[in-house]
Amino acid sequence: MSDSPQNPGPSSLKIYFRLLGYVKPYIGMFLLSIVGFLIFASTQPMLAGILKYFVDGLSNPDAALFPNVQWPWLRDLHLVYAVPLLIILIAAWQGLGSFLGNFFLAKVSLGLVHDLRVALFNKLLVLPNRYFDTHSSGHLISRITFNVTMVTGAATDAIKVVIREGLTVVFLFLYLLWMNWKLTLVMLAILPVIAVMVTTASRKFRKQSKKIQVAMGDVTHVASETIQGYRVVRSFGGEAYEEKRFLDASQSNTDKQLRMTKTGAVYTPMLQLVIYVAMAILMFLVLWLRGDASAGDLVAYITAAGLLPKPIRQLSEVSSTVQRGVAGAESIFEQLDEAAEEDQGTVEKERVSGRLEVRNLSFRYPGTDKQVLDDISFIAEPGQMIALVGRSGSGKSTLANLVPRFYQHNDGKILLDGVEVEDYRLRNLRRHIALVTQQVTLFNDSVANNIAYGDLAGAPREEIERAAKAANAKEFIDNLPQGFDTEVGENGVLLSGGQRQRLAIARALLKDAPLLILDEATSALDTESERHIQAALDEVMKGRTTLVIAHRLSTIEKADLILVMDQGQIVERGSHAELLAQNGHYARLHAMGLDEQAPAPVG
């Protein structure tokens, strides 16, 4: 799968700059936050400087703060009053900077994460089917949740630390250079060592972050599968197996998290040691080369130098946060850069008659050599029903998926009303097609909203009720606690299988599309549900061109044309009676299980 971390991909810097490109809509707030952090950082050397006046004031508290200025009120300001007042003013100035920086950067960062999350979800809506075939739902969900959270760290904490602590280091270095540039140059000698350590650690952090990202996707995937299939898990006694599967996935994630923590736990103390060695050398030189500096000057210089390790350490630690964010952003951008479904058609029709022609159609799935469909040809005139019959894996579902362009076929043509399906605008093409599949998809919403879904949203309640009645669903809907406004639960969990299928048929009836693609359910239902569903299917197929993957004999007998498929080819075609008379593939399939009696009609 493409979730694998092996691909080195683009550089961290390139990815991070692309991530920061999402800041453009918030540039005003971003600049305000930088102003705030500038204010905050400027207070650090001020605090060191105020100690100079405090120490000097110990021996002469009545000394003037600014003895050489011309304004009397400032010239007469004594240290005993000035130092406490300045500390309060510096604290207020620092508080203002902290508020501006933190608040506005949080707005920028949360907006950025929101934009990324929405962009990811919107991209999922237009990605081709093959993308979902090669990416597990767990990993896709993990990108929207966990990976975006990693980006949040890079876009909030990391930027805040880089700007605030970076500016603090700059201001403190400028202050130290101003006080004694020779001594300060000694400290600069450690910068190459720090740079090498940060670069080495960054590579490790990014590599480990990618592995964590994949491991977290595995955790989400296992949990998602187990939750969705909890009935199968319980009925087949799969609890122990799923426990072990989740335990292994979670343990793998924990181990990778610990390895990353270990890297940080080793790296940070080593960096601190380097910084404090430089500080020790600096203090030795200060004491040895004291010169004519006052005690206040020395205290201020040592204090400013002592304030440096904390922001430098925080800057070094931010590397792991940034690399986690870069790893998350890389997978996010991989999805955002994926090409959407091909939609280069220009034809739009208000309504089609429903004439479907498949001409010399061949298809194989991307990345495989096996021909799934081979030279398929047939014509369905408006209102006709074509039944596809064959063993599992014969290509029936693939053929049905090619008509609404869920996949792009390799050779041949599919024409709707004489126009190739590729020439239609994708949205317009699918507007003419109603789809009823075996696996009914319902959303955690009301019954009415599940029937009037998507383009059908906003349909009058009378039309929704009419569609439900035609699908033999209105009776059970009226018996629900809140009727059409009853919530059906996730994927219709509060409804029976037969009820879910009737809602799907009602949805197709409300759409009133000229072309119906129907994959009959193979699941065994009670006789009452079977009768209701068969009656609903008869209603939904009236007057529509229908391509049905048929499992019921009653459906097959009504077909205008039966296509018998085997290994991607049409091996027989004709009516039910004609095919039985041939005593070939269809006759054998009929003998194996297509001979059940049609349910009795409703009413």
From Swiss-Prot:
One family name in Pfam for this protein: ABC_membrane
Keywords noted in UniProt: ATP-binding, Cell inner membrane, Cell membrane, Lipid transport, Membrane, Nucleotide-binding, Translocase, Transmembrane, Transmembrane helix, Transport
SUPFAM superfamilies named in the record: ABC transporter transmembrane region, P-loop containing nucleoside triphosphate hydrolases
SMART domains to which the protein is assigned, alphabetical: AAA
Residue ranges occupied by any ABC transporter domain in the UniProt entry: 356-592
Record field: transmembrane: 20-40, 79-99, 170-190, 269-289
Top-level taxon in the UniProt lineage: Bacteria
Record flagged with keyword Coiled coil: no
Listed GO MF terms: ABC-type transporter activity; ATP binding; ATP hydrolysis activity; ATP transmembrane transporter activity; ATPase-coupled lipid transmembrane transporter activity; ATPase-coupled transmembrane transporter activity
Topology with respect to the bilayer: Multi-pass membrane protein
CDD domains named among the record's database cross-references: ABC_6TM_MsbA_like, ABCC_MsbA
Location of the protein in the cell: Cell inner membrane
PROSITE patterns referenced in this protein's UniProt entry, alphabetically: ABC_TM1F, ABC_TRANSPORTER_1, ABC_TRANSPORTER_2, MSBA
Chief location: membrane
Listed EC numbers: 7.5.2.6
Alphabetized InterPro entries for the sequence: AAA+_ATPase, ABC1_TM_dom, ABC1_TM_sf, ABC_transporter-like_ATP-bd, ABC_transporter-like_CS, ABC_transpr_lipidA, P-loop_NTPase, Type_1_exporter
GO BP: lipid A biosynthetic process; lipopolysaccharide transport; transmembrane transport
Residues involved in ATP binding: 390-397
Family per record: Belongs to the ABC transporter superfamily. Lipid exporter (TC 3.A.1.106) family.
NCBIfam families membership: MsbA_lipidA
Domain-related comment: In MsbA the ATP-binding domain (NBD) and the transmembrane domain (TMD) are fused.
Job description of the protein: Involved in lipopolysaccharide (LPS) biosynthesis. Translocates lipid A-core from the inner to the outer leaflet of the inner membrane. Transmembrane domains (TMD) form a pore in the inner membrane and the ATP-binding domain (NBD) is responsible for energy generation.
Subunit structure of this chain's protein: Homodimer.
Name of the molecule in the record: ATP-dependent lipid A-core flippase
High-level lineage: Bacteria, Pseudomonadati, Pseudomonadota, Gammaproteobacteria, Pseudomonadales
Gene behind the chain: msbA
